[in-house]
Amino acid sequence: MKRNVLYFLLLLLPFLSAAQELNCRVEVNSDQIQGTNKEVFMTLKEAITEYINDRKWSTAQISPVERIDCSMLFTVKEYTDNRFVCELQVQSRRPVYNSSYTTTLINFKDTKVEFNYQQYEPLVFSETSIESNLTAVINFYVYMILGVDFDSFSPMGGTPFYELAHQVVNLGQSSMEAGWKAFEDTRNRHALLSAFIEQGTAGFRQLWYDYHRGGLDEMALSVDKGRAKITDAIQQLQKVYEAAPMSVLIPLFKDAKLDELVNVYSKAPVSEKESVYETLSGIYPCLLYTSDAA
């Protein structure tokens, strides 16, 4: 009996080592669309879910339990003749070592997502062409999710995924669709990718690694050491802000991390709290108004 079980596990091993990378929850919110057959929105949700979760996106060896938890929420603003105008909220999380806590990595809203989709139309993957703007947008954010996740585990670990995202952006620029072009918007897909690959903001990727591996992951063993590393990362964030105050990385960090930092420093010495607050309020003036209101 034991030999049979072992044989079964050996047969299963190749499939476990080549598991898909993502466990993505997809939602398509059509509440703003009236007088339309809602079935197309459910079909779209199912198609996107299968497209993301059933695909192997890289050569990385990831077991089923290591799949990255993420979500994509498409809010449909307009729908006419198979043309969708949407906002897309992308979120991803990763577990913190030696704890049950998960930390947010991405919490990003794309306000310019438009695509054509006919019900039951297959979503076709391609690395070398734009099959549809929908799959191009999905591909881009999948690669960004993978890049940011791998950056949090190893220094510059996400580079291969940013290179793939760069290919998608280059292809997207040749289309007439919004969101792909430089200088079109400071928070579009082109701006998001550029922030991760430009030399001027390279320090962000290092602080991202320090914050997670040296900071959060360390706190289960030593709260003080882990928190000190997070404080160092915040000081690095200030340098990124000074070099590129309009970078999309600044609101990206805020949307993912500010609530978490309240808990990180809840039991820190007063002097440490004040120092961190002073640094962050210089980057995010909204904190000053929040403090005054409190």
Question: Predicted regions span which residues?
Answer:
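Bacterial Sec-dependent N-terminal signal peptides
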Residues: 1-22
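Start-of-domain marker
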Residues: 21-82
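Sec-exported extracytoplasmic/periplasmic mature domains
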Residues: 49, 53-57, 147-151, 262, ...
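Acidic/His-rich structured neighborhood in mature extracellular/periplasmic domains
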Residues: 82-191
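Flexible, glycine-rich surface segments
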Residues: 158-246, 250
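N-terminal targeting/trafficking signals and adjacent low-complexity tails
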Residues: 243-273, 277
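Conserved small/polar residues in nucleotide/adenosyl-binding loops
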Residues: 289-294
